[in-house]
A protein has these predicted regions:
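Short alpha-helical segment that forms part of, or immediately flanks, the ligand-binding pocket
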Residues: 18-26, 40
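A charged, aromatic-enriched C-terminal amphipathic alpha-helix characteristic of glycosyltransferases
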Residues: 67-105
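Aromatic "clamp/platform" in nucleotide-sugar-dependent glycosyltransferases that forms part
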Residues: 13
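Short alpha-helical donor nucleotide-sugar binding micro-motif in glycosyltransferases
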Residues: 1-5
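Active-site helix-initiating loop/hinge in glycosyltransferases
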Residues: 6, 16-18
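Short hydrophobic beta-strand element within catalytic cores of glycosyltransferases
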Residues: 26, 30-34
Length: 105
């Protein structure tokens, strides 16, 4: 779905770590996000922060942008889906081992 988009627009007032923004960046989309979001997603030049309380800058900024290839910047910032998946599998395997050890006691 993201590959069919020209840009990712995320005017949110409150978010933790907006993973959807990281996913959009990984797909090469320029991201227009509200200035209220965490700076943890400022991992490449494809992020444009806009004021959440003023629609005019949003309208002015979003105009059929060019897709960007930001994959290296994203991975360098520690957002690698393969690495994250491996860490999650490791965590589940460790939890399973601990649960099995407790059953054997």
């Amino acid at each position: 779905l993201l590959q069919a988009m020209d840009a990712f627009v995320f005017p949110s007032k409150w978010e933790g770590l907006p993973v959807s923004v990281v996913e959009a960046l990984s797909s090469g989309l320029p991201c227009y996000i509200s200035d209220t979001l965490t700076h943890d997603v400022d991992i490449c030049d494809a992020v444009t922060r806009l004021p959440i309380d003023d629609p005019r800058p949003w309208v002015d900024s979003i105009s059929l942008p060019c897709r960007v290839d930001a994959r290296r910047d994203i991975e360098a910032a520690g957002f690698d889906i393969h690495d994250s998946a491996r860490k999650l599998v490791d965590l589940y395997e460790k939890a399973e081992r601990l649960a099995n050890e407790r059953k054997c006691r």
